[in-house]
Design a protein with these regions (language model features):
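Basic, flexible Lys/Arg- and Gly-enriched helix-loop patches that mediate nucleic-acid binding at interfaces
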Residues: 1-202
Length: 202
């Protein structure tokens, strides 16, 4: 636009070069056993090993060592902070494989809430995902990013989580064809949707 083009002392200046960097968001399909820290004394693989190196990426939340699935990274620190803040109430959906027979009463309790050591927590939604025998899959939604929150809610009712995979963050779903430890940039309209969800301008 004309506003982006000015002349100073007869020299053409492109203001776009000096404007704030365009917001980028990257999704990664984290594999279980990969850490979310930048450095590790044990030499284990980090999620940062699988990211493009030409950008300073900020991780949006984290997944524990034994969890897998969708992780988001952005070059916009404000966006990362707002997406992580509990007041934003952003949906995080997980596929969870649970060992043990879960009753309707158990599900009601998980939705109504349980007092954990760091305060009250609950699932906003629980749906059955299938499975046979003692191991069954469930899809659960939380709106906070507390450490090991999904596992701790199940463990509070004496159930063991044998697998935990994040499948969705806000309205961003992990594509079926995104392989383990593979990353992919979000499309501009997906980035805009995330910015809108926390009332940030692009």
């Amino acid at each position: 636009t004309i506003a982006d083009k000015v002349t100073i002392d007869g020299r053409f200046i492109d203001l776009k070069r000096y404007s704030e960097e365009e917001t980028k968001v990257l999704m990664l399909n984290k594999q279980a056993g990969v850490i979310c820290s930048n450095k590790d004394e044990e030499g284990r693989k980090s999620v940062f090993d699988f990211l493009p190196e030409n950008t300073r990426w900020v991780m949006v939340g984290r997944l524990d060592l034994n969890s897998a699935g969708l992780l988001l990274f952005t070059n916009n620190g404000d966006l990362a902070n707002k997406l992580m803040h509990p007041s934003s109430e952003i949906d995080r959906e997980y596929a969870v494989r649970v060992l043990g027979r879960v009753s309707d009463e158990d599900i009601k309790q998980l939705i109504s809430g349980i007092e954990l050591e760091d305060g009250f927590a609950k699932f906003h939604k629980v749906t059955i995902g299938g499975g046979d025998g003692a191991n069954r899959w469930y899809h659960v939604v939380v709106r906070e990013g507390r450490k090991r929150e999904v596992r701790r809610l199940w463990e509070a009712l004496d159930f063991k989580v044998s697998r935990l995979i994040r499948t969705r963050f806000s309205d961003i779903r992990m594509p079926d064809n995104l392989r383990a430890n593979q990353s992919e940039l979000l499309k501009p309209k997906q980035v805009q949707s995330l910015l809108n969800s926390v009332n940030l301008l692009p």
